[in-house]
Amino acid sequence: MSSPLECAKYLLSAHTPHQLPSDDGSEVAFAGRSNAGKSSVLNTLTRQNALARVSKTPGRTQQLVYFTVTPQRYLVDLPGYGYAKVPKELQIHWQAFIDTYFHHRQSLRGLVVVMDIRHPLKEYDLQMLAYARQRGLPAQALLTKADKLGRGQQAQTLQKVRNELTKHFADHINIQTFSSKSRQGVEQLHTVIETWLGLARSG
């Protein structure tokens, strides 16, 4: 049974709040540090190798990129954060834009925070999860590149991150491992996002 996410198509790139689509649909946002594997996650979820641009240059995503799944239902690729080579004034601009987006975007149904399983829960990751918590939105902490660790190390890291998230957010954040290479966790994430967007599977 195929996922409706596989129908995703590029819609637009927004540099300011005024360029966003009308705020009357449903959307799921993807946030993550530069090089956490966010573009690969989007491409894997949609089974499209070039939907989100995978770059060797961290911080390449410099706008909110919208992908239409069905009319009025979107996946949103947020700018990669935490990369030192992005000019300070641009960092300030994006921080203000992201603040506005999280506090005022009524269409937002959930947030996926993408983290490299080898370097989880940096300050920016916690900040993104805090945004979701403040809005009362569901959030999924996604530990990517799980294939880089053995099963034992994965389980150990998963438990460590779960304990840390519980300390900060009680039990309000879901957590899972994910690998674009082995497709580990893909179905689990499909289910989460389809539920948030109110999408039904086709036979």
Swiss-Prot record:
Highest taxon in the source lineage: Bacteria
Example GO BP: division septum assembly
Database matches in Pfam families: MMR_HSR1
GO molecular function: GTP binding; metal ion binding
Keyword Cell division among UniProt keywords: yes
Cofactor: Mg(2+)
Residues annotated for Mg(2+) binding in this entry: 39, 61
GO CC field: cytosol
Binding site for GTP: 32-39, 59-63, 77-80, 144-147, 178-180
Sorted UniProt keywords: Cell cycle, Cell division, GTP-binding, Magnesium, Metal-binding, Nucleotide-binding, Septation
Domain EngB-type G as annotated: residue spans: 24-199
InterPro entries: G_ENGB_dom, GTP-bd, GTP-bd_ribosome_bio_YsxC, P-loop_NTPase
HAMAP family, A to Z: GTPase_EngB
Family from the record: Belongs to the TRAFAC class TrmE-Era-EngA-EngB-Septin-like GTPase superfamily. EngB GTPase family.
PANTHER family referenced in this protein's UniProt entry, alphabetically: ENGB-TYPE G DOMAIN-CONTAINING PROTEIN, MSS1/TRME-RELATED GTP-BINDING PROTEIN
Function text: Necessary for normal cell division and for the maintenance of normal septation.
Protein name: Probable GTP-binding protein EngB
Lineage: Bacteria, Pseudomonadati, Pseudomonadota, Gammaproteobacteria, Lysobacterales
